[in-house]
Amino acid sequence: MPAVVTDQFRILNASNFVDTVTGIGGTDPSNSFYVTLGLPNPTIVGFGRTSTWNTSTPNPVDNINNNNNIGDTTLFGKRVTGKNVRRLIRKVDWTQGTRYEMYRHDYSIDSPSPVTQSARLYDSRYYVINENFNVYICIDNGSSGINTTGNASQDQPTFTDLEPSRAGESGDGYIWKFLYTVSPSDIIKFDSTEFIAVPNDWTTTNDATIQAVRENGDSDLNNNQIKKVYIDNQGNGYSGGVGQEFNILGDGTGGKVVVDVVGGKITNAVISAGGKGYTYGIVDLGTINANASIKAKLIPIIPPSKGHGFNVYEELGTDRVLCYARFGGDNKDFPFDTKFAQVELVKNPTSVGTTSIYFSDSYSSLNSIKFPSTTTSVPTIGEKISQSVTGGTAVGYVASFDKETKVLKYFQDRSLYFGNGEDQTDYVGISTLGQKFAFQSTANPITAPSGFSGSVETTFSSGITTVGTKNVGLGVTFTNGLAEPEINKGSGDIIYIDNR
């Protein structure tokens, strides 16, 4: 049986995700989301890696096995809050001389948009963003049954009036409807060459500008639903002249259109009353069609929801979401000397040693080792370190080394214990080399192939160290020179993976 996942389902999914991040109504979220960075050594021989990563980046693998490994190779995370998540739409810049498409409720495979041949409204070019970051929807582009693609736009819309209007005096036939202005903070966080940010909480916000647009689009308040009647066929043999007003029939009420008849043909149709409650409409030309030899076809264009501007998520098709995270500042959770090849979005990681959801602004998911200030050698990011410990040898990959604080951060993933680095193929020595050992707070040196060598500062138990005359916070608390991650390794649900 034929079936389809609808556009409205996609829009709903995006809205549900935003609500999950921000909390319903924007308060007291019960979930915690983090953008994480990981995999600093993607080109070595190892599980989930490839020597050609930097030139031919592989597609992410979505299964439990790979997700578990991502948990082991993650470096750190930054929390995403309601201020840092937005719905998105495709960016369509206004450019003089470009032919845009008008909003229509009936684009389909059988009746695609005339310029881009899009079967979906949301794939067509029916809205623009101008140089001032104002977003407008195209109510009319001068198109009709005898000019199906409309005209090239000559006048950039810049007005912020509530009612649809032409943008200038060129006569290009365009009528634009102002929707909103992208805020300066959203420009800084979310602007890109591909997408436009859409404000959160459109349907409930008390922001004066948005509220005015929303209420102007509420036909229950102002009987202002329909803005355009499209002349698909002018017909012939119609009586009367210019300025004749007719009712718009259908399942709504109050809609009226003023029609001009010239030479028996309908040459113009302008809404005089938008009405309310329409999901379809038909113009009642019964008083002038008695002698019509060719029947006219006038199509009332039905806005989404209650009217243009009432619900921009439905109007613009906000089926994408962007999360913004800024890694920087003095936060020691984010080492600046590392690399990363994967970006993830993780939901509800748990605090180390507990089952409680982690809610702090950021976290380190790496183990840390504090070396004495006299340590002079420096390891290479991504290389293997090792230490002789009780029962065997502890091994790990270097994620970061702070030359000032002498803190080394490392991770341990399955590649260290697979004989070939990649899978479970048996090998000689597996009984000892296949076991995972933790680094220990002993005098036994930690070494690396680059020549790095140093011993744990076993007397260091603090989250602050002294560098010269400064006290420097380390982001984690050490006990006898060792520190655990701030979250349980691999905890939380990975809902997005991006290989870089």
Model-found features: residue ranges?
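Tryptophan-rich substrate-binding surfaces of secreted polymer-degrading and adhesive proteins
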Residues: 1-221, 293-297, 387, 392-396, ...
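Conserved, function-critical positions that sit in or immediately flank catalytic
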Residues: 169-500
